[in-house]
Amino acid sequence: DRSSAAIPDPSQPSGWRQLTGDEVGSLLGDQKAREVVAVTEPADLPSQMLANSIVSSRLLSKIAEDLGVGHTNTLTGFKWISRVPGLVFGYEEALGYCVDPDYVRDKDGISASTKLAALAASLKSEGRTLQDKLDDFAKKFGLHATGPLTIRVEDLSLIAKGMENLRSEGLKEIAGSPVVKTIDLAEGSDKLPPTDGMMYFTERDDRVVVRPSGTEPKLK
């Protein structure tokens, strides 16, 4: 149910670099959006939806806006992504991709791997690589760097206490940049149902999402 990929990188000791889930998601999402644009009337494009979880990169939303297709964020998990009306592509940063929801309306590593291989082959025929495509995104939309941090605990009560402290005390600064906006995901919104989590935005537009794992004794 997952798809992982590595690309040649001479700067790495192994000669290879593993792509992040967000990098693969942006590559596959852009590929799918372009396929949709080629066969869809312009007036219908906003109903053709790209989707990703709230803990995934914001890059896909910019790709969607640039190409004129729709985009939405969902809670973590494909039970949410797969429910998006008009879904044509969905992903989450934990290496899960839905590239053909008409046939497999769930994360599917086999179809995602074949689509990524096809994209790599198409780029190769042009004398380009997947890294070149990622560089195109950075030049057009700005660099989107993402990184997960997981804290495993033995005492589950520590997770609840940690989330309680974040809500009661808040954060004023992250990595030297003042926090300018805080969203308590437990309050829900007109776009998202309530979930246990906090989202922070800093003055330099960094974004940090803190949430408990839904399946393991971890804070992510």
Language-model features: locations:
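Phosphate-binding and adjacent anionic-ligand microenvironments
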Residues: 1, 5-17, 27, 35-212, ...
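Catalytic or ion-translocation cores adjacent to nucleophile or general acid/base/metal-coordination motifs
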Residues: 21-31
